[in-house]
Amino acid sequence: MADQDNPVFQIQRVYLKDLSLEQPNSPAILLEQEQPNLDIQLGVEATPVGEGFFEVAVTATVQTKIKDKTMFLVEAKQAAIFEIRNVPEDQMGQIMGVVCPQIVYPYLRGNVADVINRAGFPPVHLGEINFQGMYEQQQAQAAGAAAPVTTQ
Protein backbone atom coordinates (compact mmCIF):
# COMPACT_ATOMS: atom_id res chain seq x y z
CA MET A 1 0.00 0.00 0.00
CA ALA A 2 3.04 2.30 0.15
CA ASP A 3 2.60 3.05 -3.59
CA GLN A 4 -0.61 4.96 -2.79
CA ASP A 5 1.42 7.55 -0.86
CA ASN A 6 4.18 8.05 -3.45
CA PRO A 7 4.14 11.41 -5.22
CA VAL A 8 2.65 11.30 -8.73
CA PHE A 9 3.45 13.84 -11.46
CA GLN A 10 2.40 12.89 -14.98
CA ILE A 11 1.47 14.76 -18.13
CA GLN A 12 -1.85 13.44 -19.39
CA ARG A 13 -2.17 15.61 -22.50
CA VAL A 14 -0.76 18.77 -24.09
CA TYR A 15 -3.05 20.72 -26.40
CA LEU A 16 -3.57 24.05 -28.14
CA LYS A 17 -6.62 25.49 -26.39
CA ASP A 18 -7.01 28.78 -28.27
CA LEU A 19 -5.32 30.52 -31.19
CA SER A 20 -6.29 33.64 -33.10
CA LEU A 21 -4.59 35.79 -35.69
CA GLU A 22 -5.79 39.21 -36.80
CA GLN A 23 -4.39 41.40 -39.59
CA PRO A 24 -6.83 44.31 -39.41
CA ASN A 25 -4.85 46.66 -41.66
CA SER A 26 -3.78 44.25 -44.40
CA PRO A 27 -2.92 44.56 -47.21
CA ALA A 28 -2.00 48.28 -46.99
CA ILE A 29 0.20 47.92 -43.91
CA LEU A 30 2.24 45.21 -45.64
CA LEU A 31 3.62 47.88 -47.97
CA GLU A 32 4.95 50.00 -45.09
CA GLN A 33 8.73 50.33 -44.98
CA GLU A 34 8.93 51.40 -41.34
CA GLN A 35 10.10 48.92 -38.70
CA PRO A 36 7.19 47.70 -36.53
CA ASN A 37 7.10 47.81 -32.73
CA LEU A 38 6.67 44.46 -31.00
CA ASP A 39 4.78 43.87 -27.73
CA ILE A 40 4.66 40.44 -26.07
CA GLN A 41 2.63 39.59 -22.97
CA LEU A 42 2.63 36.24 -21.20
CA GLY A 43 0.49 34.75 -18.48
CA VAL A 44 0.03 31.47 -16.59
CA GLU A 45 -3.24 29.98 -15.35
CA ALA A 46 -3.75 26.83 -13.26
CA THR A 47 -7.16 25.26 -12.70
CA PRO A 48 -8.21 22.03 -10.97
CA VAL A 49 -10.21 19.83 -13.37
CA GLY A 50 -10.80 16.79 -11.19
CA GLU A 51 -9.44 14.93 -8.19
CA GLY A 52 -5.66 15.09 -8.63
CA PHE A 53 -5.89 16.58 -12.15
CA PHE A 54 -5.00 20.15 -13.09
CA GLU A 55 -5.01 22.17 -16.28
CA VAL A 56 -2.08 24.56 -16.60
CA ALA A 57 -2.21 27.04 -19.47
CA VAL A 58 0.37 29.50 -20.74
CA THR A 59 -1.03 32.42 -22.73
CA ALA A 60 0.76 34.76 -25.11
CA THR A 61 -0.38 37.94 -26.81
CA VAL A 62 1.95 39.13 -29.58
CA GLN A 63 1.18 42.43 -31.27
CA THR A 64 3.16 44.37 -33.85
CA LYS A 65 2.31 47.94 -34.75
CA ILE A 66 3.56 50.55 -37.16
CA LYS A 67 2.75 53.90 -35.58
CA ASP A 68 -0.77 53.39 -34.23
CA LYS A 69 -1.83 50.72 -36.74
CA THR A 70 -1.76 47.03 -35.90
CA MET A 71 0.22 44.92 -38.33
CA PHE A 72 -0.83 41.66 -36.68
CA LEU A 73 -2.14 40.39 -33.38
CA VAL A 74 -1.73 36.78 -32.22
CA GLU A 75 -3.40 35.44 -29.09
CA ALA A 76 -2.57 31.88 -28.10
CA LYS A 77 -3.26 29.61 -25.16
CA GLN A 78 -1.35 26.35 -24.86
CA ALA A 79 -2.48 24.02 -22.10
CA ALA A 80 -1.79 20.65 -20.55
CA ILE A 81 -3.52 18.36 -18.11
CA PHE A 82 -1.29 17.13 -15.32
CA GLU A 83 -1.96 14.41 -12.78
CA ILE A 84 -0.46 15.57 -9.49
CA ARG A 85 -1.06 13.55 -6.34
CA ASN A 86 0.53 13.09 -2.92
CA VAL A 87 2.61 16.24 -3.24
CA PRO A 88 2.95 18.47 -0.16
CA GLU A 89 0.60 21.46 -0.37
CA ASP A 90 3.46 23.93 0.13
CA GLN A 91 5.07 22.65 -3.12
CA MET A 92 1.95 22.86 -5.29
CA GLY A 93 2.30 26.58 -6.07
CA GLN A 94 5.83 26.09 -7.35
CA ILE A 95 4.80 23.06 -9.42
CA MET A 96 1.82 24.89 -10.97
CA GLY A 97 3.62 28.20 -11.45
CA VAL A 98 7.07 27.00 -12.52
CA VAL A 99 7.40 23.30 -13.40
CA CYS A 100 4.20 22.89 -15.44
CA PRO A 101 4.59 26.14 -17.44
CA GLN A 102 8.18 25.15 -18.31
CA ILE A 103 6.77 21.99 -19.89
CA VAL A 104 3.94 23.76 -21.77
CA TYR A 105 5.84 26.85 -22.97
CA PRO A 106 7.92 25.23 -25.77
CA TYR A 107 4.69 24.07 -27.44
CA LEU A 108 3.30 27.61 -27.22
CA ARG A 109 6.50 29.07 -28.69
CA GLY A 110 6.33 26.73 -31.66
CA ASN A 111 2.66 27.40 -32.37
CA VAL A 112 3.07 31.18 -32.17
CA ALA A 113 6.12 31.18 -34.46
CA ASP A 114 4.31 28.87 -36.91
CA VAL A 115 1.11 30.93 -37.19
CA ILE A 116 3.05 34.18 -37.66
CA ASN A 117 5.19 32.56 -40.36
CA ARG A 118 2.13 31.07 -42.11
CA ALA A 119 0.54 34.53 -42.09
CA GLY A 120 3.41 35.73 -44.28
CA PHE A 121 5.46 37.56 -41.68
CA PRO A 122 9.00 36.87 -40.51
CA PRO A 123 8.73 34.56 -37.50
CA VAL A 124 8.69 36.05 -34.03
CA HIS A 125 10.59 33.78 -31.69
CA LEU A 126 9.49 34.03 -28.09
CA GLY A 127 12.54 33.99 -25.85
CA GLU A 128 13.22 31.74 -22.91
CA ILE A 129 11.18 32.65 -19.84
CA ASN A 130 12.33 32.47 -16.24
CA PHE A 131 9.14 31.03 -14.78
CA GLN A 132 10.80 30.83 -11.37
CA GLY A 133 11.39 34.60 -11.42
CA MET A 134 7.90 35.22 -12.77
CA TYR A 135 6.41 33.07 -9.98
CA GLU A 136 8.46 34.82 -7.29
CA GLN A 137 7.40 38.23 -8.65
CA GLN A 138 3.74 37.23 -8.51
CA GLN A 139 4.16 35.92 -4.97
CA ALA A 140 5.83 39.17 -3.91
CA GLN A 141 3.01 41.24 -5.43
CA ALA A 142 0.59 39.57 -3.01
CA ALA A 143 -2.22 37.09 -2.79
CA GLY A 144 -4.48 37.81 -5.70
CA ALA A 145 -5.12 37.05 -9.30
CA ALA A 146 -2.02 36.34 -11.35
CA ALA A 147 -1.39 39.40 -13.48
CA PRO A 148 0.18 38.91 -16.93
CA VAL A 149 3.86 39.73 -17.04
CA THR A 150 5.04 41.82 -19.99
CA THR A 151 8.33 40.89 -21.64
CA GLN A 152 10.09 42.66 -24.44
Swiss-Prot record:
Gene Ontology CC: one annotated term: cytoplasm
GO biological process: protein folding; protein tetramerization; protein transport
GO MF annotations, alphabetized: unfolded protein binding
Location in or out of the cell: Cytoplasm
Keyword Cytoplasm found: yes
Entry superkingdom: Bacteria
Key words, A-Z: Chaperone, Cytoplasm, Protein transport, Translocation, Transport
Family to which the UniProt record says this protein belongs: Belongs to the SecB family.
Assembly and interaction partners: Homotetramer, a dimer of dimers. One homotetramer interacts with 1 SecA dimer.
Its biological purpose: One of the proteins required for the normal export of preproteins out of the cell cytoplasm. It is a molecular chaperone that binds to a subset of precursor proteins, maintaining them in a translocation-competent state. It also specifically binds to its receptor SecA.
NCBIfam families xref list: PRK05751.1-5, secB
Protein name listed in UniProt: Protein-export protein SecB
